[in-house]
Regions:
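Conserved donor NDP-sugar-binding/catalytic core segment of glycosyltransferases
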Residues: 99-153
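Short aromatic/hydrophobic "clamp" motif used to bind/position activated sugar donors
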Residues: 87
Length: 263
């Protein structure tokens, strides 16, 4: 039996359909020696029931009470539970290309963080993926051919979904271009050695609202310890699934509510 070398940590919240697509994509990865840690910032019965049905993957499912945005706390638990020396972090609404893990693992270096990005198709293509009318493999293999359809669908960051093969001319061109532009952590797609993130004591759990700088914070602290950022854009690629962004659920739990007299 192959010994796992990589822990894939997936931060999830309620979106079972997206997780299903992610796990299907993980089953089709070219690199096989990995475990999956599902870090659920909540305790959805639907999520648990679905995960219990999944076969052919080594999965650890961690959850916690749904009392506000506590993603960082959940990620710290996942780091502790991981059994591998190399960690890849992805979000639960982002589906990886079949070579995603292979690219992260083969490009790893000591004292470096690999920083990737994501492409963001609009509602039409995201719905096709969610409904199973196209697979993630079909999405990426026809990516260039569907350029105009994707643009019509108001895709964002189209260039981030172009996969670059190893040792190709395109790889050399992109590597040169990437070296001119400093890499930064985006929480949906990055990886590091486990010892490096333990060195900085993991994620700061004082961040209790999304998009408030938790990615920037962990990058800043890693740089302080001499850990450098390197780009894996166009090598470890993934696509985001379109959804409405609504943070009211979290702000209502954090902000004091007006009394009856104040209403």
């Amino acid at each position: 039996m192959l010994k796992n070398q990589v822990s894939i940590i997936i931060a999830v919240y309620r979106d079972v359909v997206a997780l299903d697509l992610i796990l299907k994509a993980l089953k089709n990865q070219t690199y096989k020696k990995f475990e999956v840690i599902i870090a659920e910032d909540g305790q959805s019965e639907e999520m648990k029931e679905f995960i219990d049905t999944v076969n052919d993957l080594t999965i650890k499912h961690l959850s916690q009470e749904d009392i506000g945005w506590r993603k960082n706390k959940m990620l710290n638990k996942a780091i502790i539970e991981s059994s591998c020396d190399y960690l890849i972090f992805i979000d639960g609404d982002c589906v990886p290309h079949e070579k995603f893990i292979e690219e992260h693992y083969n490009r790893r270096k000591n004292n470096f963080v690999l920083c990737g990005r994501r492409t963001e198709p609009g509602e039409k293509f995201s719905t096709l993926l969610r409904e199973g009318k196209i697979s993630i493999d079909m999405f990426f293999t026809s990516y260039l051919k569907n350029y105009f359809h994707l643009k019509k669908d108001e895709i964002r960051h189209y260039e981030e979904g172009i996969y670059c093969k190893q040792n190709s001319i395109l790889e050399k061109l992109i590597t040169i271009k990437s070296s001119r532009k400093e890499a930064h952590i985006v929480g949906c797609n990055w990886s590091c050695n486990k010892e490096d993130i333990l060195k900085i004591n993991g994620f700061d759990e004082d961040f209790e609202l999304p998009t408030t700088g938790e990615d920037t914070d962990i990058e800043r602290r890693m740089r302080h310890f001499g850990i450098k950022m390197i780009s894996c854009r166009n090598f470890a690629i993934m696509t985001h699934l379109h959804h409405k962004k609504n943070f009211n659920h979290y702000t209502k739990q954090l902000l004091p509510q007006p009394s009856e007299a104040q209403k």
